[in-house]
Every structure is written in structure tokens, then in C-alpha cells.
Regions:
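N-terminal Rossmann-like FAD-binding beta1-loop-alpha1 element of flavoenzymes
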Residues: 4-29
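A short, basic/flexible loop-to-alpha-helix module at the beginning of a structural domain
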Residues: 1-2, 113
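Conserved N-terminal/central alpha/beta ligand/cofactor-binding core
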Residues: 32-174
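Phosphate-coordination loops involved in phosphoryl transfer and adenosine-cofactor binding
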Residues: 2-4, 154
Length: 175
């Protein structure tokens, strides 16, 4: 099997990376089991983002720093929080059916927002209590529909040969 980019893992991170990279490269995604067997599909609550009038990035950042007892990397927290609204909009465009029922946001959507522990504002978008499953299904569908992405379930990498110099890397399983 030859590919420009090999991604090991078919959860939200792996599939999101595959969709982004497939704009310019041939991408193969390996999953050690079924594509939806990872942790993403089990996430229940929702995704936090500043989407409500009156909420601010600064407030969300402070809530996150307090919840992390100051152990979080502030630059990382700021980056994630400032990009969360656009990430949620991308997920919605991929077909994640976030619950509706809130005020119209900057994307013209009326997502229902909840408030969960550690948050000072309503900022959790959700799909009932199965947000992870909905996100996983939307990402899988988009990846399946992309001609530059090959999805390989039930495959654990063991010997990978990469680059012009035939460097060899080993992990458990087999390709």
C-alpha cells in the first residue's frame, strides 16, 4: 500500500486531519478495529465554544484555566477556544445535527446551548447525549466521500517503510 500520508487512528483528530490533508495529498487512515470503535463515538456531553451573545473568549479562557487548576498551557487554551466556533461551524457543515433552540449566532444558526460544570456561560453545543457519535458519523461520511482518502478498518500497523531512504518503523500488528 502506498500513500502520501498515513494517519493511524480514525477518531475525530485522525479524520479531521485526513479531511484537511486530502485537499492536497492522498491520505490513508488506519483503524485498529471498526472506524467508530475509538473514544470519539463515546463522548456524550457536547463541545464548548463562545457562541452566545454576552459570552467572551476571555471568559471561556478563564473558566478553562480555573478548571485546569492552572496546569493548562495558556497559549494552547487560547488557540483552541478562539478557533472553536469555526470548528463547530465546520462540523455542522459536514452534517453534525446539533440540537436547535437558541438565539441566532454569527453563523446564522440557532443551536441549543447548555451550561456544564466549570463554565460561567451556556456554551455547550450538543446532539442530545450522543454528540461524539454524531461527530464520528459525520466525519466518517465525509472521509468516505473524499476520493483522496482511503479508510482501512481492522488494521494495526507493524512495519512501515517511509521516505526515499526506506527508513523503517515498527509498531504492533501488521500491514
Amino acid at each position: 500500500m502506498e500513500t502520501d500520508i498515513l494517519i493511524i487512528g480514525s477518531g475525530a483528530a485522525g479524520l479531521t486531519a485526513a479531511l484537511q490533508l486530502a485537499q492536497k495529498h492522498k491520505v490513508t487512515v488506519l483503524a485498529k478495529g471498526a472506524l467508530s470503535d475509538g473514544a470519539t463515538a463515546w463522548a456524550q456531553g457536547g463541545i464548548a465554544a463562545v457562541l452566545e451573545p454576552g459570552d467572551t473568549f476571555e471568559s471561556h479562557i478563564e473558566d478553562t484555566m480555573v478548571a485546569g487548576a492552572g496546569l493548562n498551557n495558556r497559549q494552547t487554551v487560547e488557540f483552541v477556544i478562539e478557533h472553536a466556533p469555526q470548528a463547530i461551524d465546520r462540523l455542522a457543515k459536514l452534517g453534525v445535527p446539533f440540537n436547535l433552540g437558541g438565539p441566532t449566532n454569527e453563523f446564522g444558526e440557532q443551536w441549543h446551548l447548555t451550561r456544564e460544570g466549570g463554565h460561567s456561560h451556556r456554551r455547550i453545543v450538543h446532539v442530545n447525549d450522543a454528540t461524539g457519535w454524531a461527530v464520528q458519523q459525520a466525519l466518517e461520511s465525509a472521509a468516505r466521500d473524499n476520493p483522496n482518502i482511503t479508510l482501512v478498518p481492522d488494521m494495526v500497523a507493524i512495519d512501515l517503510i517511509v521516505g526515499r531512504h526506506q527508513e523503517r518503523f515498527s509498531t504492533s500488528g501488521r500491514v
